[in-house]
Design a protein with these regions (language model features):
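Transmembrane beta-barrel domains of Gram-negative outer membranes and organellar outer membranes
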Residues: 22-162, 167, 173-245
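Cleavable N-terminal export/targeting peptides
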Residues: 1-34
Length: 245
Protein backbone atom coordinates (compact mmCIF):
# COMPACT_ATOMS: atom_id res chain seq x y z
CA UNK A 1 0.00 0.00 0.00
CA UNK A 2 2.85 2.41 0.83
CA UNK A 3 4.50 1.75 -2.54
CA UNK A 4 1.21 2.35 -4.35
CA UNK A 5 0.86 5.65 -2.50
CA UNK A 6 4.34 6.74 -3.58
CA UNK A 7 3.56 5.87 -7.21
CA UNK A 8 0.25 7.76 -7.02
CA UNK A 9 1.86 10.90 -5.59
CA UNK A 10 4.63 10.72 -8.19
CA UNK A 11 2.09 10.37 -11.01
CA UNK A 12 0.17 13.40 -9.75
CA UNK A 13 3.38 15.45 -9.62
CA UNK A 14 4.24 14.46 -13.19
CA UNK A 15 0.80 15.56 -14.37
CA UNK A 16 0.96 18.91 -12.59
CA UNK A 17 4.44 19.64 -13.93
CA UNK A 18 3.45 18.78 -17.50
CA UNK A 19 0.32 20.95 -17.45
CA UNK A 20 1.99 23.95 -15.82
CA UNK A 21 4.95 23.90 -18.19
CA UNK A 22 3.11 24.20 -21.50
CA UNK A 23 4.00 27.87 -21.87
CA UNK A 24 7.73 26.96 -21.91
CA UNK A 25 7.50 24.18 -24.50
CA UNK A 26 8.92 26.24 -27.37
CA UNK A 27 11.95 27.53 -25.44
CA UNK A 28 15.39 26.82 -26.85
CA UNK A 29 17.19 24.32 -24.60
CA UNK A 30 20.93 24.40 -23.90
CA UNK A 31 21.33 21.77 -21.19
CA UNK A 32 25.13 21.82 -21.33
CA UNK A 33 25.16 24.62 -18.74
CA UNK A 34 23.74 23.70 -15.29
CA UNK A 35 22.74 27.32 -14.63
CA UNK A 36 20.28 27.16 -17.54
CA UNK A 37 17.05 26.13 -15.83
CA UNK A 38 14.29 24.18 -17.59
CA UNK A 39 11.21 22.24 -16.56
CA UNK A 40 11.99 18.59 -17.21
CA UNK A 41 11.34 14.98 -16.24
CA UNK A 42 14.32 12.64 -15.89
CA UNK A 43 14.01 8.87 -15.62
CA UNK A 44 17.04 6.60 -15.25
CA UNK A 45 17.88 2.96 -14.71
CA UNK A 46 20.42 2.76 -11.87
CA UNK A 47 22.87 0.09 -10.78
CA UNK A 48 25.03 0.30 -7.63
CA UNK A 49 27.88 -2.00 -6.64
CA UNK A 50 29.02 -1.84 -2.99
CA UNK A 51 32.31 -2.92 -1.44
CA UNK A 52 30.68 -5.72 0.60
CA UNK A 53 29.28 -7.39 -2.53
CA UNK A 54 25.79 -5.92 -2.27
CA UNK A 55 24.11 -4.72 -5.46
CA UNK A 56 21.22 -2.28 -5.80
CA UNK A 57 19.29 -1.54 -8.96
CA UNK A 58 16.10 0.16 -9.97
CA UNK A 59 14.88 3.50 -11.26
CA UNK A 60 15.50 7.09 -10.25
CA UNK A 61 12.84 9.68 -11.11
CA UNK A 62 13.92 13.31 -11.13
CA UNK A 63 11.38 16.10 -11.66
CA UNK A 64 12.55 19.68 -12.13
CA UNK A 65 10.16 22.62 -12.33
CA UNK A 66 11.42 26.03 -13.48
CA UNK A 67 9.15 28.73 -12.08
CA UNK A 68 10.98 31.14 -14.39
CA UNK A 69 14.46 31.20 -16.02
CA UNK A 70 16.10 31.92 -12.65
CA UNK A 71 14.27 29.69 -10.13
CA UNK A 72 14.03 25.91 -10.12
CA UNK A 73 12.75 23.24 -7.73
CA UNK A 74 14.02 19.65 -8.03
CA UNK A 75 12.48 16.54 -6.46
CA UNK A 76 14.23 13.18 -6.87
CA UNK A 77 12.73 9.81 -5.91
CA UNK A 78 14.74 6.55 -6.25
CA UNK A 79 13.00 3.16 -6.24
CA UNK A 80 15.62 0.45 -5.70
CA UNK A 81 16.03 -3.27 -5.05
CA UNK A 82 18.72 -4.52 -2.64
CA UNK A 83 19.82 -8.04 -3.59
CA UNK A 84 21.36 -8.70 -0.17
CA UNK A 85 18.26 -7.91 1.90
CA UNK A 86 15.90 -8.97 -0.94
CA UNK A 87 14.04 -5.70 -0.42
CA UNK A 88 12.48 -3.26 -2.88
CA UNK A 89 11.25 0.20 -2.03
CA UNK A 90 11.84 3.91 -1.97
CA UNK A 91 15.37 5.04 -1.18
CA UNK A 92 16.42 8.43 0.21
CA UNK A 93 14.69 11.26 -1.63
CA UNK A 94 16.20 14.61 -2.51
CA UNK A 95 14.81 18.15 -2.73
CA UNK A 96 16.85 21.01 -4.19
CA UNK A 97 16.11 24.68 -4.81
CA UNK A 98 18.26 26.68 -7.22
CA UNK A 99 18.16 30.46 -7.75
CA UNK A 100 20.26 32.36 -10.27
CA UNK A 101 20.77 35.82 -8.77
CA UNK A 102 22.90 37.26 -11.57
CA UNK A 103 23.70 36.40 -15.18
CA UNK A 104 26.29 37.63 -17.67
CA UNK A 105 28.38 39.51 -15.11
CA UNK A 106 31.16 39.61 -17.71
CA UNK A 107 31.64 37.91 -21.07
CA UNK A 108 33.13 34.89 -19.27
CA UNK A 109 31.58 35.05 -15.79
CA UNK A 110 28.11 33.95 -16.87
CA UNK A 111 26.17 33.22 -13.66
CA UNK A 112 26.11 33.08 -9.90
CA UNK A 113 23.51 30.96 -8.13
CA UNK A 114 22.89 30.04 -4.47
CA UNK A 115 21.19 26.73 -3.74
CA UNK A 116 19.73 24.61 -0.95
CA UNK A 117 19.89 20.80 -1.14
CA UNK A 118 18.18 18.38 1.26
CA UNK A 119 18.44 14.57 1.30
CA UNK A 120 15.54 13.00 3.24
CA UNK A 121 16.01 9.58 4.93
CA UNK A 122 12.89 8.08 3.37
CA UNK A 123 14.59 4.75 2.62
CA UNK A 124 14.75 1.90 5.12
CA UNK A 125 18.19 1.66 6.73
CA UNK A 126 17.60 -1.90 7.98
CA UNK A 127 16.72 -3.04 4.45
CA UNK A 128 19.77 -1.35 2.96
CA UNK A 129 17.78 1.28 1.09
CA UNK A 130 18.51 4.42 3.12
CA UNK A 131 21.14 6.29 5.12
CA UNK A 132 19.08 7.03 8.28
CA UNK A 133 20.27 10.66 8.32
CA UNK A 134 19.15 14.00 6.98
CA UNK A 135 21.76 15.82 4.89
CA UNK A 136 21.30 19.56 4.39
CA UNK A 137 23.55 21.67 2.17
CA UNK A 138 23.44 25.39 1.44
CA UNK A 139 25.89 26.87 -1.00
CA UNK A 140 26.79 28.77 -4.12
CA UNK A 141 27.58 27.84 -7.75
CA UNK A 142 29.29 30.09 -10.27
CA UNK A 143 29.43 29.72 -14.05
CA UNK A 144 32.56 30.57 -16.02
CA UNK A 145 33.26 30.20 -19.76
CA UNK A 146 36.76 28.93 -20.52
CA UNK A 147 36.10 28.68 -24.26
CA UNK A 148 33.04 28.40 -26.53
CA UNK A 149 32.98 24.63 -25.91
CA UNK A 150 34.28 24.38 -22.32
CA UNK A 151 32.73 25.91 -19.21
CA UNK A 152 33.13 25.38 -15.47
CA UNK A 153 30.59 25.56 -12.67
CA UNK A 154 32.54 25.37 -9.40
CA UNK A 155 30.50 25.23 -6.22
CA UNK A 156 30.97 25.34 -2.47
CA UNK A 157 28.47 24.44 0.22
CA UNK A 158 28.08 24.14 3.99
CA UNK A 159 26.90 20.63 4.93
CA UNK A 160 24.99 19.50 8.04
CA UNK A 161 24.29 15.80 8.66
CA UNK A 162 21.93 14.86 11.49
CA UNK A 163 22.30 12.20 14.20
CA UNK A 164 21.46 8.67 13.00
CA UNK A 165 18.67 6.82 14.81
CA UNK A 166 19.51 3.20 14.04
CA UNK A 167 23.28 3.07 14.48
CA UNK A 168 25.93 4.72 16.63
CA UNK A 169 27.00 8.13 15.42
CA UNK A 170 26.65 11.86 15.88
CA UNK A 171 25.71 14.86 13.80
CA UNK A 172 28.36 16.39 11.56
CA UNK A 173 29.10 19.72 9.95
CA UNK A 174 31.44 20.26 7.07
CA UNK A 175 32.18 21.61 3.63
CA UNK A 176 31.43 20.38 0.12
CA UNK A 177 33.49 21.51 -2.89
CA UNK A 178 32.86 20.60 -6.52
CA UNK A 179 34.41 21.61 -9.84
CA UNK A 180 31.85 20.77 -12.48
CA UNK A 181 33.24 21.06 -16.03
CA UNK A 182 31.03 20.96 -19.12
CA UNK A 183 32.59 19.99 -22.45
CA UNK A 184 30.46 20.45 -25.58
CA UNK A 185 31.34 18.31 -28.58
CA UNK A 186 28.49 19.66 -30.71
CA UNK A 187 25.11 21.33 -30.27
CA UNK A 188 23.70 17.94 -29.27
CA UNK A 189 26.50 16.17 -27.39
CA UNK A 190 28.20 17.24 -24.17
CA UNK A 191 29.97 15.76 -21.16
CA UNK A 192 29.93 16.72 -17.46
CA UNK A 193 33.10 15.99 -15.46
CA UNK A 194 32.66 16.74 -11.77
CA UNK A 195 35.17 15.82 -9.03
CA UNK A 196 33.64 16.36 -5.57
CA UNK A 197 35.16 16.39 -2.09
CA UNK A 198 33.18 16.59 1.16
CA UNK A 199 34.93 17.36 4.44
CA UNK A 200 33.05 15.82 7.40
CA UNK A 201 34.44 13.59 10.18
CA UNK A 202 36.34 12.01 7.31
CA UNK A 203 37.08 13.29 3.84
CA UNK A 204 34.82 11.76 1.18
CA UNK A 205 35.91 11.79 -2.46
CA UNK A 206 33.25 11.27 -5.11
CA UNK A 207 32.76 12.19 -8.75
CA UNK A 208 30.44 12.38 -11.73
CA UNK A 209 31.11 11.53 -15.36
CA UNK A 210 27.94 12.07 -17.37
CA UNK A 211 27.63 11.99 -21.18
CA UNK A 212 24.51 13.59 -22.67
CA UNK A 213 23.06 13.59 -26.19
CA UNK A 214 20.04 15.53 -27.43
CA UNK A 215 18.01 13.15 -29.60
CA UNK A 216 15.36 15.75 -30.36
CA UNK A 217 16.47 19.38 -29.98
CA UNK A 218 14.62 21.23 -27.19
CA UNK A 219 12.67 18.10 -26.25
CA UNK A 220 14.41 14.75 -25.62
CA UNK A 221 17.86 13.85 -24.24
CA UNK A 222 19.60 10.61 -23.27
CA UNK A 223 22.49 10.27 -20.82
CA UNK A 224 25.01 7.70 -19.62
CA UNK A 225 26.61 8.33 -16.24
CA UNK A 226 29.24 6.91 -13.90
CA UNK A 227 29.10 8.18 -10.30
CA UNK A 228 31.91 6.73 -8.16
CA UNK A 229 32.33 7.10 -4.40
CA UNK A 230 36.07 6.53 -4.14
CA UNK A 231 36.22 6.74 -0.34
CA UNK A 232 33.51 4.15 0.35
CA UNK A 233 34.26 2.05 -2.75
CA UNK A 234 30.78 2.38 -4.30
CA UNK A 235 30.24 2.45 -8.06
CA UNK A 236 26.97 3.77 -9.49
CA UNK A 237 25.95 3.62 -13.16
CA UNK A 238 22.90 5.28 -14.72
CA UNK A 239 21.29 5.23 -18.15
CA UNK A 240 18.45 7.66 -18.53
CA UNK A 241 16.28 9.95 -20.59
CA UNK A 242 15.19 13.55 -20.10
CA UNK A 243 11.99 15.06 -21.43
CA UNK A 244 11.95 18.86 -21.56
CA UNK A 245 8.46 20.29 -21.16
Amino acid sequence: MKLFRYYFILSMCLTVVQLSAQKMKDASVDASKPTNLYTQINSAFEYQSLKNGTHLFGTRINIQYAFNPDNLLLVEVPLLYNDNSKSFGISDTRVRYFHVVKRNITSRFIAIAPFADVTIPSGSFTKGLGSDVWSITAGLVAGYLISPKISMFPGIGYVHVTDPNKYAGSSQNGLNIQTNMSVSFSKRAFLFINPIVTFLSKTIWTGELNFNYMITPNKLKINFGYFPNFTNDISTFRIGTTLFL
